[in-house]
């Protein structure tokens, strides 16, 4: 999985970058067709904003955004949100691909 980390109005330290990579590498557990992950950290008026964009199957994009004072906590929250979104997407795909044929009973 390709992970790109960008900072707007803030320098992304190696500790933060390593933390993002360790958390982002857990996302394929929720959905294994992740193409790439983009993380944008922004600092504005005493608040940080963490935005994570996950592209899957080359046609679906999932975005999670959080704002707060602690960068590490924001990353945790964003990864948690994306985990829920990816799980929901996976379940949705699973349910659409397999129609339940048990409702159709052949009478003979």
What are these regions (language model features)?
Residues 1-108:
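N-terminal, polar/charged subdomain of small-to-medium soluble alpha/beta proteins
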């Amino acid at each position: 999985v390709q992970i790109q980390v960008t900072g707007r109005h803030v320098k992304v330290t190696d500790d933060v970058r390593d933390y993002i990579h360790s958390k982002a590498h857990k996302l394929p557990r929720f959905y294994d067709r992740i193409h790439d992950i983009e993380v944008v950290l922004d600092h504005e008026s005493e608040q940080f904003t963490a935005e994570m964009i996950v592209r899957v199957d080359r046609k679906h994009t999932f975005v999670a955004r959080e704002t707060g004072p602690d960068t590490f906590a924001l990353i945790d929250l964003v990864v948690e949100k994306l985990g829920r979104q990816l799980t929901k997407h996976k379940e949705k795909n699973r349910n659409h691909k397999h129609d339940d044929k048990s409702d159709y009973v052949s009478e003979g």
